[in-house]
């Protein structure tokens, strides 16, 4: 076995059954569950994120769930720091960190590290916000196109958070975000096709999804309708009533939430909201599959198979995660 402590990544698209398998693994192994989900971090956003129930969380505690208010932001860099701390604590207790979720950017940040970006600066952000109010975000998008055309091509003018961040990075250091990312790629000596990574762990990577895409689509539609039956609209109404929340926040832009928000604003009918929520979730799953197809060293399992737990345990022994 490797001298490095073990860790397990359990990835997959939304509605694939990751949580159920993670809990089964936690029953079978001395694991500590760590959420890798950019929506589950928010308090008060339970139904639309398919957050495990309070009863399940009491039985299977997850780190990095309910750690932010919906008015707050949370970056991949913050996740990396929090996840590494949670993994270190689990290892110190003699337990295996089991990271489960579908936010692929977070996994990538863990494995490869992040570009050495400057931190957020309140004064610079306030100046950008003032310019946006005076001139509009499209004018700021044109500014970005002059100094960082690659980021401008990637960021929509109606995405103020990412637009502000790209301008902030340039104004703080005089170097574009695109150049910083290229520098990171060139310096990424600790990560290559052989599977080396910047984590001080021996990592086994599992992925779960239905073999047939139409099966996943049916599960997505069924789950979204179940969320509506469980009170999803009332959950978003509580958020909508808060004066400090708006449609531009990362929390409210989460899949499902932005569609219900538009419904509450009178922009969509109930039927349109339902259809668009399902379509948006399917698009999320497609993006997750795109990430996963480019991933190396993944062990895939079929969501519909009845023997995923023994198969996962067998694989973990094969790659020396388990004795």
Curated annotation (Swiss-Prot):
Protein's GO biological process: tRNA modification
Necessary cofactors: Mg(2+)
E.C. no: 2.5.1.75
Ranges where the record places region Interaction with substrate tRNA: 37-40, 161-165, 253-258, 286-293
Enzyme class, first EC level, given as a word: transferase
Entry's Gene Ontology molecular function annotations: ATP binding; tRNA dimethylallyltransferase activity
Site (Interaction with substrate tRNA): 103, 125
Binding, substrate: 14-19
Gene3D superfamilies: 1.10.20.140, P-loop containing nucleotide triphosphate hydrolases
Catalytic reaction list: adenosine(37) in tRNA + dimethylallyl diphosphate = N(6)-dimethylallyladenosine(37) in tRNA + diphosphate
Keyword check for Lipid metabolism: no
Key words of the record: ATP-binding, Magnesium, Nucleotide-binding, Transferase, tRNA processing
Residues binding ATP: 12-19
Similarity-based family: Belongs to the IPP transferase family.
Summary of the function given for this chain in its UniProt record: Catalyzes the transfer of a dimethylallyl group onto the adenine at position 37 in tRNAs that read codons beginning with uridine, leading to the formation of N6-(dimethylallyl)adenosine (i(6)A).
Subunit structure: Monomer.
Full protein name: tRNA dimethylallyltransferase
Organism this protein belongs to: Pseudomonas aeruginosa (strain ATCC 15692 / DSM 22644 / CIP 104116 / JCM 14847 / LMG 12228 / 1C / PRS 101 / PAO1)
């Amino acid at each position: 076995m490797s001298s490095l402590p073990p860790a397990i990544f359990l990835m997959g698209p939304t509605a694939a059954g990751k949580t159920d398998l993670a809990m089964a693994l936690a029953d079978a192994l001395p694991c500590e569950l760590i959420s890798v989900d950019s929506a589950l971090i928010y308090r008060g956003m339970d139904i639309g994120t398919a957050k495990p129930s309070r009863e399940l969380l009491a039985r299977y505690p997850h780190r990095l769930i309910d750690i932010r208010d919906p008015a707050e932001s949370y970056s991949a860099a913050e996740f990396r720091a929090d996840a590494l701390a949670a993994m270190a604590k689990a290892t110190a207790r003699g337990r295996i960190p089991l990271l489960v979720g579908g936010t692929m950017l977070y996994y990538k940040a863990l494995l490869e590290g992040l570009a050495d970006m400057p931190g957020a600066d309140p004064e610079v952000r306030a100046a950008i916000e003032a310019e946006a109010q005076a001139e509009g975000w499209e004018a700021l998008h044109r500014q970005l196109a002059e100094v960082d055309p690659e980021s401008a091509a990637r960021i929509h003018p109606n995405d103020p958070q990412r637009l502000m961040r790209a301008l902030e990075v340039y104004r703080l250091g005089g170097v574009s975000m695109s150049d910083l990312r290229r520098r990171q790629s060139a310096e990424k000596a600790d990560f290559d096709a052989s599977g080396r990574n910047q984590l001080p762990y021996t990592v086994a990577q599992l992925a779960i999804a239905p073999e047939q895409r139409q099966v996943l689509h049916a599960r997505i539609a069924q789950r979204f309708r179940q969320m509506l039956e469980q009170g999803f609209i009332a959950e978003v109404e509580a958020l909508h009533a808060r004066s400090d929340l708006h449609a531009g926040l990362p929390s409210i832009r989460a899949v499902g939430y932005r569609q219900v928000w538009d419904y509450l604003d009178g922009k969509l009918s109930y039927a349109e909201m339902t259809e668009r929520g399902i379509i948006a979730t399917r698009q999320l799953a497609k993006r997750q599959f795109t990430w996963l197809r480019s991933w190396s060293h993944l062990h895939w399992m079929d969501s519909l198979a009845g023997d995923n737990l023994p198969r996962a345990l067998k694989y973990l022994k094969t790659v020396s995660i388990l004795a």
